[in-house]
Amino acid sequence: KDKFDYAPQDYSDAMDSYDKVLEITGEITGEIINPNAEGVDEEGPHCADGRVEYASGTRQNLDAMVKAGLNGMTMPRRFGGLNFPITPYTMCAEIVAAADAGFGNIWSLQDCIETLYEFGNEDQHSRFIPRICAGETMSMDLTEPDAGSDLQSVMLKATFDEKENCWRLN
């Protein structure tokens, strides 16, 4: 407890924290996300000034989740996360997806932080992870002929060219 701020005192304290976050997630999905779902589908995203803008309900959903501290749940507190294990996050993701599967996909893009946290350097951590936890940025873009958005079918590979000091694609 002395080493980590906000560390649970014991098992019961940890479970209380997880239960509270699940309760908050349920409240947000029941009061905001689910009621917005149909309108989000009808409005859809649109392009404005060369940028993709979410439907207004999607923005409300994201704002509510960020305000509740539910972005970057598994990240350390120094980056704005809750320092939770993956299991409570996954349970929250199930609740969100049950309310609106499309929004569940958007909100769960925070999964990408795990890769950045594991393999990124400290500069990348400090520049990007707090912004993701704050809901300022996150995306995953992938496509390839004959694969589309099916990540399992992507064949592109990157290899490092030491001679040229750069990455080469296929």
Show where each model-derived region lies:
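N-terminal glycine-rich flavin-associated loop
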Residues: G104-E122, G148
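Short, surface-exposed, charged/polar-biased interaction segments
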Residues: E42, H46-G50, I86, I113, ...
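Proline- and acidic/polar-enriched loop/turn elements at helix boundaries
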Residues: R77-R78, S108, E144
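Glycine-rich, Trp-frequent "lid" loop and neighboring beta-strands that shape
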Residues: L82, D123-N170
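Small-side-chain structural scaffolding
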Residues: T25, T29, I33, A37-G39, ...
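Amphipathic, small/basic residue-rich leader segments at the start of a protein or domain
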Residues: K1-G104, D123, R127, C166
